[in-house]
C-alpha cells in the first residue's frame, strides 16, 4: 500500500485520466474493476448524460471511481449537484480554480484532487484545500501549461 492506494481505496496506484469524449462509464468501470481508479470525464457531457454514466458505472463496478469536472464547465452547479446526489466519492477538478467548489465537495465527504500545470497552480490548489494534485506538463493532451512534467 502507498498514499495513493490508501487515499482512493484502490489496489494499484494507477489513475485513468478523465479525458473528454473518451472516458465514459465503460472505461472508468474497467479500470476500477482492474484495481486502478477509473474516472468519468464530465467535460463533454450534458448533466443528465453524466448522471446516466455515473449510474451505469455504479452497476458495472463495486470499486471506487470518480468524475473529472473542468471548472469552466457551463453547467457546473448542476453537475456538482448530480455528483452529490449520485454518491460519487472522488472528484478530480481541472481547467480553472478549484476554490469555489472544494469546500462544498469536502463537506459532502468527497475526496477532491485538482489537475495542475505549474507549481504555482499546485500551491493555489493546496490553499483551496484539495486532498491532492495531479501535475501535468504541456505534453498532456488538452492542457495549456508551459512546463514539462519533468520540471514540475
Kindly label every feature range from the protein language model.
Residues 1-152:
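Active-site entrance/lid segments in N-terminal catalytic domains of soluble metabolic enzymes
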